[in-house]
């Protein structure tokens, strides 16, 4: 559905050049909910604007749906025949891509109905057809009773529902969501994510979701790309990224969405709960779906003579698969603890020594 190859974008500012995208390559499957996560300045918002060519990359190629391969060079876009794309062609491509933002960008002096109808005004549709389409969209986002209401009378979650309906007016194949839940409270965020999940299922809609919140990725996405300084530093299935993140920034994001992140605060405070003695190691254990429910902890304690003191533990479900986590103090002779850690790693329990009392 969406293919990006070696995409680059540099902004030339008075203060110097800023590389927003650095050799980005991504493949996003048809009908997928795909997440892109990163901190401010990572390049994720530039990436989403380049997907619909609101911002033209300096180089690379792009293919969205039936657009064919678009070659990007020196800030210009060229079609499969090597011809510079006209505004008409770019407009046709953009109509196949809807977009929602953190700030809803609604017309304050227009009703909900008029806001949703706005993209259809200049398409040549008959008035009756526009009305039918708008009410179809209102039903889709559960706002039919708000058709004649103005944005100022809506909650934040309702405003985002209007923005989603407007983005879907032209029946796009792709919906780009740029921090669409960042301005919402937790309940409204959950409701919008449920709506996006429902639209993905009902319409077969491909959704690219830009966020800085790993909890959002965990809740709705199937795959995720982690961006830092304009580059994709890690990419994969959401479950695999949570189970064994490789890049330092990915580990930080994963930790932020885990109940086990409390260990960091406990360590900062110097709590004795997480302070290993001379013969102990403080270890983070991640239990892959293949071993959740197995008796690995009791086996390690019994067979290797290792004392295990559980400090924190958690099991969550990601993409319908369980993922377990534990912070524990492992005590015993050095060789026994090392053998126990090796056994755990061989049995789909990934281990990370956080602190070592012998050092």
Named regions from a protein language model:
Residues 235-236, 244:
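ABC ATPase "signature
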């Amino acid at each position: 559905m969406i293919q990006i190859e070696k995409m680059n974008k540099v902004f030339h500012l008075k203060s110097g050049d800023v590389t927003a995208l650095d050799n980005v390559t991504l493949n996003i499957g048809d009908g997928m909910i795909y997440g892109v996560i990163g901190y401010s300045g990572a390049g994720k918002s530039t990436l989403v604007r380049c997907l619909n060519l609101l911002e033209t990359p300096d180089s690379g190629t792009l293919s969205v749906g039936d657009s064919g391969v678009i070659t990007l060079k020196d800030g210009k876009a060229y079609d499969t025949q090597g011809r510079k794309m006209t505004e008409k062609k770019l407009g046709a491509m953009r109509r196949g891509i809807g977009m929602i933002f953190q700030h809803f960008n609604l017309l304050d002096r227009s009703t909900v109905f008029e806001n949703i109808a706005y993209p259809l005004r200049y398409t040549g549709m008959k008035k009756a057809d526009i009305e039918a389409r708008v009410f179809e969209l209102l039903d889709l986002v559960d706002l039919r009773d708000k058709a004649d209401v103005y944005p100022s009378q809506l909650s934040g979650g309702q405003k985002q529902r209007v923005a989603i309906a407007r983005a879907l007016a032209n029946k796009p194949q792709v919906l780009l969501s740029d921090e669409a839940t960042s301005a919402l409270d937790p309940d409204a965020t959950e409701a919008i994510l449920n709506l996006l999940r429902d639209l993905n299922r009902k319409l077969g809609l491909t959704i690219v979701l830009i966020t800085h919140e790993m909890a959002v990725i965990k809740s709705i996405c199937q795959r995720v790309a982690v961006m830092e300084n304009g580059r994709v530093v890690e990419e994969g299935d959401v479950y695999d990224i949570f189970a064994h993140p490789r890049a330092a920034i990915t580990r930080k994001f994963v930790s932020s969405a885990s109940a086990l992140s409390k260990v960091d605060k406990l360590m900062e405070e110097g709590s004795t709960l997480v302070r290993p003695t001379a013969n102990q190691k403080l270890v983070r254990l991640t239990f892959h779906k293949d071993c959740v429910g197995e008796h690995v902890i009791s086996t390690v304690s019994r067979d290797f003579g290792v004392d295990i003191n559980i400090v924190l533990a958690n099991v969550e479900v990601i993409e319908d698969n369980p993922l377990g986590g534990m912070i524990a103090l492992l005590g015993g002779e050095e060789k026994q603890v090392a053998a126990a850690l090796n056994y755990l790693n061989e049995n789909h329990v990934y281990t990370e020594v956080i602190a070592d009392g012998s050092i």
